[in-house]
Amino acid sequence: MKNVFLDFEKGIEEFEAKIEQLRFAQDNSALDISAEITRLQAKSQGLTKSVYAKLTPWQISQVARHPLRPSTLDYIKHLFTDFEELHGDRNFADDRAIVGGLAHFNGQTVMLIGHQKGHDTKEKIYRNFGMPKPEGYRKALRLMRLAEKFSIPLITFVDTPGAYPGIDAEERGQSEAIGKNLYVMAGLRIPIICIIIGEGGSGGALAIAVGDTSLMLQYSVYSVISPEGCASILWKSADKASDAAEILGITADRLKEMALIDTIIPEPVGGAHRDYPAVMQSVRQALQESLRKLQDIPLETLLQKRLDRLLGYGRFKINKPD
């Protein structure tokens, strides 16, 4: 699929267009213009580094939503072997916005669960734009319990704008399904690694993101509400989304400062969508290290640390004036 450039990448897009024109000309000419192509590539790379070194939270949210950004199934394809997808919640239906199943990671069996948005329009519609309904969360819950039954580590991939807000989802118990997952994940007797790979939208993300360690890609976002949603509530206009993104503290750096995530996984220059092999290697290393650390901790200690971690959220200290 052809690369898609964001609004703040216009200069980069112009360089890339010139490079493509020269490549086409070289293929159809006896002239050697490789030196000029190399020069433009260096300029494009330099500009990309400059732009991405000073991204605003709002711009980072756009990168997190990039249509070519690696999805759960992309990570499964590149990092795991022998993936066997498991379907259905055994109650109502199979929600395609949630994918999950058994796989091998470096020879070890793991359970994988993740949101799946899709890359093009057809797939996005098929996956309901990554917005799960109650049956999706109940499918995830079924797989979590299966992993616990066989003492298999759980790895979840978070990438959703939020849980589906439709009437049918509410009628089938959307809030109950999310709440049940939070409750069960808090006590699952297996190691749990959660990784935010794109958007972490509100309870729809949190329903598969309660674990022992939280990893987050550099240009992902994680928040109780989208910047547009927040702006619509506070200022009655989505035009204030950039201001809302700043206030919400949705970026990996801000969340790490507040101890809401544990590890920031670096992305290639220009974002994960520009270099799949590089980001896959970074995620692989982070998963290997996290899994090794968690499996070295005795189970009862792991569960107590998880409980302490959850109960510690939201605590703050007020310094009284003398």
From Swiss-Prot:
Belongs to the AccA family. Keywords: ATP-binding, Cytoplasm, Fatty acid biosynthesis, Fatty acid metabolism, Lipid biosynthesis, Lipid metabolism, Nucleotide-binding, Transferase. NCBIfam families: accA (TIGR00513), AccA_sub (NF041504), PRK05724.1 (NF004344). Acetyl-CoA carboxylase is a heterohexamer composed of biotin carboxyl carrier protein (AccB), biotin carboxylase (AccC) and two subunits each of ACCase subunit alpha (AccA) and ACCase subunit beta (AccD). Component of the acetyl coenzyme A carboxylase (ACC) complex. First, biotin carboxylase catalyzes the carboxylation of biotin on its carrier protein (BCCP) and then the CO(2) group is transferred by the carboxyltransferase to acetyl-CoA to form malonyl-CoA. It is an enzyme of class 2 (transferase). The keyword Cell cycle does not apply. InterPro entries: Acetyl_CoA_COase_a_su (IPR001095), ClpP/crotonase-like_dom_sf (IPR029045), COA_CT_C (IPR011763). It catalyses: N(6)-carboxybiotinyl-L-lysyl-[protein] + acetyl-CoA = N(6)-biotinyl-L-lysyl-[protein] + malonyl-CoA. This is Acetyl-coenzyme A carboxylase carboxyl transferase subunit alpha. The gene is accA. It comes from the Bacteria. Residues 30-293 form the CoA carboxyltransferase C-terminal domain. Its main location: cytoplasm. Pathway: Lipid metabolism; malonyl-CoA biosynthesis; malonyl-CoA from acetyl-CoA: step 1/1. It is found in: Cytoplasm. GO terms for cellular component: acetyl-CoA carboxylase complex. GO terms for biological process: fatty acid biosynthetic process; malonyl-CoA biosynthetic process. The keyword ATP-binding applies. GO terms for molecular function: acetyl-CoA carboxylase activity; ATP binding; carboxyl- or carbamoyltransferase activity. Its EC number is 2.1.3.15.
